[in-house]
UniProtKB/Swiss-Prot annotation:
It comes from the Bacteria. Transmembrane segments: none annotated. Catalyzes the hydrolytic deamination of adenine to hypoxanthine. Plays an important role in the purine salvage pathway and in nitrogen catabolism. This is Adenine deaminase. The lineage of its organism: Bacteria, Pseudomonadati, Pseudomonadota, Gammaproteobacteria, Vibrionales. It comes from Vibrio parahaemolyticus serotype O3:K6 (strain RIMD 2210633). CDD domains: ADA. InterPro entries: A_deaminase_dom (IPR001365), ADE (IPR028892), Ado/ade_deaminase (IPR006330), Metal_Hydrolase (IPR032466). SUPFAM superfamilies: Metallo-dependent hydrolases (SSF51556).
């Protein structure tokens, strides 16, 4: 089954590009930009990736992002991620970036976006990987800061498909950003939001009803509300679940306790994603393997994660049909093996 998982076409919908910064690249960029980092080697830095909760991870995440200064830095970061996508048979990815993480420290919005966008264009042409960009607001910052960021996003509608909401969920409910999301929707942007990771099931309901999201990022605490689970099934609201992330951040103690396969079998439109793969110990294939090891599935169930992701993606129906066919063909070819 491992070989089947490796070759399975995959679609990633929940990936923070800053969270794909490999320690080796971090050291390279620190040297390039003359920045001191408080670790003597990439391996020492890797050893620091032990987290008690979301906040302990975010502290290290923001520290790492500090080495990203130039358009070329953001290009290199994104290109390395795309090479991992190619190795994992990811055919389409929709990446998050956090503008405020960079603008708050004096990096121009366009510097960030142009580097990411240029790499994604090369990824389409050289690797055959299609992509979309989603700009996320940091929920621990103010509504005013998010509104300012939205104005920058709106200048780049040709590159940015939608907006999201991430960072620490505790104490920052969806309602805080209602007006920002209303303005984004009025401008024609699609919307997604992190909810129900560390926060309660009510945050999922609020993200759907208040922010009118097309997808819920994480959403695993939906099981605390039976009516909500029923609604997710009925409306086919996608959840972009990140299994290894959930273990690393102690949302679940171990993969055997994770509810993603239970939700899949109930009919919830769950997808598998890597979130911040460098910090959480795995890219897409690693996440699929970890889930299947703890909850053995048949090939059709594994493929359903990709089919759900295709349906939930922000691409046109023609490309969705092509990708569905690709997955169905792959399963058919391997059904007797």
């Amino acid at each position: 089954m491992n070989a089947f998982i490796q070759g399975l076409p995959k679609v990633e919908l929940h990936l923070h590009i800053e969270g794909s910064l490999e320690p080796e690249l971090m050291f390279k960029l620190a040297k390039r930009n003359g920045i001191d980092i408080p670790y003597s080697s990439p391996s020492e830095l890797r050893e620091a990736y032990q987290f008690e909760d979301l906040q302990s991870f975010l502290d290290l995440y923001y520290q790492g992002a500090n080495v990203l200064r130039t358009e070329q830095d953001f290009y290199d970061l994104t290109w390395e991620y795309l090479e991992h996508c190619k190795a994992d048979n990811v055919i389409h990815t929709e990446i998050f970036f956090d503008p405020q993480t960079h603008t708050e420290r004096g990096i121009d919005f366009d510097t960030v976006l142009n580097g990411i966008s240029r790499a994604l264009t090369d990824g389409r042409e050289k690797l055959g990987i299609t992509s979309q960009i989603i700009a996320c607001f940091l929920r621990h910052l103010s509504e005013e800061s998010a509104m300012e960021t939205l104005q920058s996003v709106l200048k780049h509608r040709d590159k940015i498909i939608g907006v999201g909401l991430d960072s620490s969920e505790k104490g920052h409910p969806p309602a805080k950003f209602l007006r920002v999301f209303q303005q984004a929707k009025e401008a024609g942007l699609l919307t997604v939001a992190h909810a129900g990771e560390e926060g309660p099931a009510q945050n999922i309901t609020d993200a759907i009803e208040m922010l009118e999201v097309s997808r819920v990022d994480h959403g695993v605490r939906c099981v605390e509300d039976e009516a909500l689970v029923g609604s997710l099934i009925e409306t086919k609201m996608p959840l972009t679940v990140c299994p290894l992330s959930n273990i690393k951040l102690c949302v679940f103690d171990e993969m055997g306790q994770h509810n993603i396969v239970e939700l899949l079998r109930k009919g919830v439109a769950v997808t598998i994603n890597s979130d911040d793969p460098v910090y959480f110990g795995g890219y897409m294939t690693d996440n699929f393997l970890a889930v299947n090891q703890a909850h053995p599935m048949i090939k059709e169930e594994l493929a359903k994660f990709t089919l759900n992701a295709i349906d939930a993606s922000f691409i046109d129906n023609e490309l969705k049909a092509q990708y569905r066919h690709k997955v169905e063909q792959y399963v058919a070819q391997h059904s007797s093996m």
